[in-house]
A protein has these predicted regions:
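Buried hydrophobic positions in well-ordered alpha/beta secondary-structure cores of metabolic enzymes
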Residues: 1, 57, 72-75, 101, ...
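NAD(P)+-binding Rossmann beta1-loop-alpha1 motif at the extreme N-terminus of oxidoreductases
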Residues: 1-36
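Short amphipathic alpha-helical segments
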Residues: 6, 30-31, 84-87, 112-114
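A structural alpha-helix within SAM-dependent methyltransferase catalytic domains
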Residues: 7-10, 67, 91, 113, ...
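Rossmann-fold dinucleotide-binding core
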Residues: 102-156
Length: 156
């Protein structure tokens, strides 16, 4: 799902940083994104060239590379321990002004928001699958989600 989310944002002209612990995942992600973009391009010749879109996506195995991000969207497997580890590491590097979202469909947004120092900047941002095709995203507030956070994601 993370590849599709990265593709959606890159297609909207955002520079995207993808983090994973495995370099092998990146090869799969690159291939999946390029294939998807080529299919979309064949259906709509007016669309931007796939290479230009995929060039906006960078891949990192060092989470410190995300320190300058304004938005972080977690899309790990639905395993609370994995999500907890990601948010714990993320808490030490992101700016206090960064927004944090989870693509979860299983866990409480309020519970996940407690894993970062700024729960008011945390939200659920659940993409339907596949993200590049399904133009539907659930925006889910937690108990501590600030209205500015909700408004920001609603307008994305």
């Amino acid at each position: 799902m993370g590849s599709g989310i990265a593709q959606v944002f890159a297609s909207c002209s955002y520079c995207v940083k993808v983090y994973d612990i495995s370099e092998n995942i990146f090869n799969i992600s690159r291939k999946r994104i390029l294939t998807s973009l080529q299919k979309l391009k064949s259906k709509d010749p007016v669309k931007e060239m796939p290479d230009r879109i995929s060039d906006r996506i960078s891949y990192y195995t060092d989470m410190n590379e995300l320190a300058d991000c304004d938005i972080f969207i977690e899309s790990a497997f639905e395993n609370f321990a994995i999500k907890e580890e990601i948010f714990h590491k993320l808490s030490g590097i992101l700016k206090p002004t960064s927004f944090v979202a989870s693509n979860t469909s299983s866990y409480s947004i309020t519970a996940l928001s407690q894993l970062i120092p700024y729960p008011e900047r945390f939200i659920g941002f659940h993409f339907m699958n596949p993200p590049p095709i399904m133009e539907l995203i659930e925006v889910i507030k937690g108990l501590y989600t600030h209205e500015k956070t909700f408004s920001f994601f609603w307008k994305l």
